[in-house]
Amino acid sequence: MDHISLIGFMGSGKSSVGKELAKLLPSMELIDLDSYSEAMTGRTIPEIFENEGEAAFREMEKSALQDIFMTGELTGASYILSLGGGTVTSEACRRMIRRNSTCFYLKASIDTLVHNLETWPGDRPMLKGGKSLRSRVEELMTARGPIYEKTAHHIINVDGDDYTAAAVDIVTLK
């Protein structure tokens, strides 16, 4: 397995750790699945959520992931994949991730996630719904936490926000 997949909740530092990994592993291309999906469809993720719903987005996300792994297989390229926080909610995506990459769960506490999401809010459709940010994060993490752990080959604690150290740990474990 030449690919590295980074999974974890929104705000866990997948993009930041991915950038650090790309510096340490210059032969690997960093791909952000959300950005790849937007380029593939010509629409933003919030637009897809708003116009077609979460199920349509998850299907599109699965197609994008298949495309990336197929391209890697055909070209021999190796990728660092920064996956969306909900990518692992699809059984098909979980199987693809585990079969085609070494998967790292960037595990962060609720406090760290809330802090990071308040600092870098972005447009995150899954956090909408009238509840407080903390209660929505807690609700989603209750459902997703066990899935992240089950999907990952390795778990990296990122509560210290030292993304370079997390990237070094990943290179060591890879």
Which residues are covered by each model-predicted region?
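P-loop (Walker A) phosphate-binding loop of NTP-binding proteins
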Residues: 9
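Short glycine-rich anion-binding loops that position phosphate/pyrophosphate groups of nucleotides
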Residues: 84-88, 109-111, 161
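NTP-dependent small-molecule kinase module
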Residues: 4, 16, 20, 115, ...
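A glycine- and Lys/Arg-enriched "phosphate-lid" helix/loop adjacent to the NTP-binding pocket
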Residues: 99-145
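Conserved glycine(s) of the Walker
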Residues: 13
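ATP-dependent small-molecule kinase phosphotransfer cores
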Residues: 35-87, 91-98, 125, 138
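Post-Walker A helix-loop "phosphate-sensing" segment adjacent to the P-loop in P-loop NTPases
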Residues: 23-31
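Pre-Walker A (Motif I) flank of P-loop NTPase domains
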Residues: 1-4, 76-77
